[in-house]
Amino acid sequence: MVIEKIDDKSSNSPLTAPRLIDLIESQFSESQVSADTLIQHILESLNKHSSQYKYIVSVTSIDIPTESSSSCEIDNKFGASWNAKKDGFLTHVLEDKHAGKNHVVSVAWLSK
């Protein structure tokens, strides 16, 4: 098994990085709604661009604490365009009581 670290993670993208950013920003400007709807619109746009790829879109929403509240709420949404019979996704939360942290571990698999 060969493991390769690449600094530019968009080098093999079906869209250039600036074009992909424009697509995401335009869908956000048009939808300005829930994370689920944003995911759906981004996936639809990507699928129209190229059907040769499988796409995974994850949206993590973080409520910024206010002066009256020091707590932070985090919400994550996930959407994908794939073959549901062959591909899948699993998220599992690990509670680290000693460190006082939770670790969210996500695994996605896509058939070739």
Curated annotation (Swiss-Prot):
Keyword Cytoplasm: yes
Stated family: Belongs to the TDA2 family.
InterPro entries: Tctex-1-like (IPR005334), Tctex-1-like_sf (IPR038586)
Protein known as: Topoisomerase I damage affected protein 2
Cell compartment(s), UniProt: Cytoplasm; Cell projection
Gene Ontology CC annotation, any one: cell projection
TM regions (residue ranges): none
Taxonomic source organism: Candida glabrata (strain ATCC 2001 / BCRC 20586 / JCM 3761 / NBRC 0622 / NRRL Y-65 / CBS 138) (Yeast)
Gene Ontology molecular function terms on file: actin filament binding
Alphabetic keyword roster: Cell projection, Cytoplasm
GO biological process, one term: negative regulation of barbed-end actin filament capping
